[in-house]
Curated annotation (Swiss-Prot):
Belongs to the bacterial ribosomal protein bL27 family. The gene is rpmA. This is Large ribosomal subunit protein bL27. NCBIfam families: L27. InterPro entries: Ribosomal_bL27, Ribosomal_bL27_CS. GO terms for biological process: translation. Residues 1-9 form a propeptide. The N-terminus is cleaved by ribosomal processing cysteine protease Prp.
Amino acid sequence: MLVMNLQLFAHKKGVGSSKNGRDSEAKRLGVKCSDGQFVLAGNILVRQRGTKIHPGLNVGRGGDDTLFAKIDGVVKYERLGRDKKKASVYPVEVEEVVAE
């Protein structure tokens, strides 16, 4: 008696999957208002992770370390020593123009 051992193989090759190929969405961090720029109260000055730039005069810090203006005025970025920076907002005097 003749016994045959018949093996069938897949006719399509199995395709492996990669563990790469995805990326996180950008967080849009950075300076939003430049030095000398006029800002309104509530405007965001800097979006950051951690206190890379510290809040100065008339500047608040949000829960995610975002710096924002507390008053209307002009933004000024200043150095604190060698390695620290701070952002301040100084009030500007508005001159009223009277039409004659």
